[in-house]
């Protein structure tokens, strides 16, 4: 069986540090996620073209805009590529696209001008260049949170579940049950004993070892602890920033604590 190459393509802070993963084989290329802005999408196009491979597949691993707003640029450059996502992700994208455009209106010309609607992934795997990428994750409390597992290369493409060097985005998981389920998914991910791990959000050039799993889990546990012993979001935020003074993506701790404390709605 031919070997695959994996490359993480980082995005700037202004794009919430959202990564994409470029997978290449002897002939073809696959992208996992499509960038937050149109500029992100154009950068992905440049990277794919530099490989000289044919882009056949774009898997959108989650329904938040930083996972797919750049898809328009990718589709324009590679009109024959298939865009795929799970059924919950497709539903989420369709239901929230217009409201997310309004929420991120300050991005102006970086916003997409049309929706690229992914096809629903048939089954629970993607076969690329003869290699199976298994869809893992999801839970009763987190039905739309998946990751990809490639057994032959022992690779985890962690998507929305993994952060590295950043505050973890918890605004979309406002309940303790959801965050506990998230930790369970991380435990299952670690049990696979991966040797290459891609975080969905990370500081540029972070390592591709188990650290993203460890960091995300430790942060979620600390988040729960500080929520339990602080009176309001401001105090919880201060406590988390004191624990993790070096982390980026501070908007995540600001919004996450407010949502968890019931001081604002998000979604």
Predicted regions and their residues:
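Short catalytic-loop micro-motif centered on adjacent basic/acidic residues
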Residues: 30-33, 57-61, 134-135
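Metallo-beta-lactamase
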Residues: 36-37, 139-140, 145-214
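Divalent metal-coordination and catalytic microenvironments
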Residues: 23, 33, 48, 62, ...
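Active-site HxH/HxHxD metal-binding segment of metal-dependent hydrolases
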Residues: 50-125
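Short acidic-hydrophobic surface loop/beta-edge motif
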Residues: 23, 123-128
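Accessory terminal helices/loops
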Residues: 191-193, 203-267
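Conserved beta-strand hairpin/beta-sheet module of binuclear metal-dependent hydrolase folds
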Residues: 2-50, 147-159
């Amino acid at each position: 069986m031919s070997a695959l190459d994996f490359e993480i393509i980082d995005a700037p802070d202004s794009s919430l540090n959202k990564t994409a993963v470029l997978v290449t084989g002897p002939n073809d290329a696959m992208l996992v996620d499509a960038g937050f802005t149109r500029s992100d999408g154009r950068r992905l196009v440049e990277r794919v073209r530099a490989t000289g491979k044919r882009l056949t597949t774009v898997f959108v691993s989650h329904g938040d805009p930083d996972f797919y707003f750049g898809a328009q640029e990718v589709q324009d450059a590679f009109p024959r590529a298939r865009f795929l996502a799970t059924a919950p992700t497709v539903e989420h994208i369709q239901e929230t696209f217009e409201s997310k455009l309004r929420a991120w209106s300050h991005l102006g010309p970086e916003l997409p001008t049309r929706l690229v609607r992914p096809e629903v992934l048939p089954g629970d795997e993607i076969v690329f260049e003869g290699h199976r990428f298994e869809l893992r994750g999801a839970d009763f409390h987190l039905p739309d949170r998946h990751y990809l597992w490639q057994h032959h290369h022992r690779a985890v493409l962690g998507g929305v579940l993994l952060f590295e060097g950043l505050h973890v985005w918890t605004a979309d998981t406002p309940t303790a049950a959801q965050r506990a389920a998230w930790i369970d998914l991380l435990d299952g991910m670690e049990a696979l004993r991966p040797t290459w791990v891609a975080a969905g959000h990370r500081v540029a050039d972070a390592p591709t070892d188990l650290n993203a799993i460890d960091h995300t889990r430790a942060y979620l546990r600390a988040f729960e602890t500080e929520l339990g012993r602080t009176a309001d979001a401001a105090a919880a935020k201060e406590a988390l920033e004191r624990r993790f003074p070096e982390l980026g993506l501070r908007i995540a701790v600001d919004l996450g604590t407010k949502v968890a404390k019931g001081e604002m709605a998000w979604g």
